[in-house]
């Protein structure tokens, strides 16, 4: 697993992406963050906002300055810590295969969920951003990530609710790609419009 170590946390993953963008001298980058990846792209945008043209959050965590994944989703703490202690030497959360997870899944480092994010650059809030909630056929208000789409609305971001499950990149990749290209094109043309509900 890339960068797997008990010492590596959220800041490690953020810096890894920042380094790639800087080394490759990339401009107008569109960052897409799924699930935990939402925290990563927020952190990247905080460090190098001028290189980022869009942020797209897919059913992801949407942290504020000083928060951790566990602080905004406390219902997950016991499960993940137990899994890490039982089968991950106390620091690595094993893949849960019970629901037919894809073979490409990898263990997750516990420290990434307990480390605080730094979001102190106001320029990141000027980046056109989109938040999609995947409600899995249920009312959006009942979804555990509904709090994040509410945050996105408060920030005047484009938002949309899909009936998909948490992992459309596995179950409906063509539909997901089509919708992503659509929103990227709209933002690129500067037609921000009103946030969708």
What are these regions (language model features)?
Residues 103-122, 143-144:
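Active-site nucleophile elbow and catalytic-triad environment of alpha/beta-hydrolase enzymes
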């Amino acid at each position: 697993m890339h960068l797997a170590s008990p010492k590596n946390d959220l800041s490690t993953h953020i810096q890894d992406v920042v380094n790639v963008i800087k080394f490759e001298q990339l401009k107008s980058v569109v960052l897409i963050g799924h699930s935990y990846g939402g925290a990563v792209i927020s952190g990247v945008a905080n460090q190098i906002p001028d290189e980022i043209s869009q942020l797209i959050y897919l059913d992801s965590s949407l942290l504020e300055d000083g928060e951790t994944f566990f602080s905004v989703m406390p219902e997950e703490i016991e499960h993940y810590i137990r899994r890490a202690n039982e089968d991950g030497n106390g620091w690595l959360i094993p893949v849960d295969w019970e629901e037919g997870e894809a073979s490409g899944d990898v263990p997750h480092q516990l420290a990434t969920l307990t480390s605080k994010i730094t979001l102190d650059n106001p320029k990141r809030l000027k980046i056109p951003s989109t938040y999609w909630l995947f409600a899995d056929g249920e009312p959006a208000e009942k979804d555990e990530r509904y709090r994040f789409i509410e945050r996105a609305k408060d920030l005047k971001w484009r938002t949309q609710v899909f009936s998909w499950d948490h992992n459309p990149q596995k179950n409906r990749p063509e539909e997901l790609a089509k919708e992503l290209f659509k929103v990227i094109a709209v933002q690129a043309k500067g037609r921000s419009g009103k946030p969708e509900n």
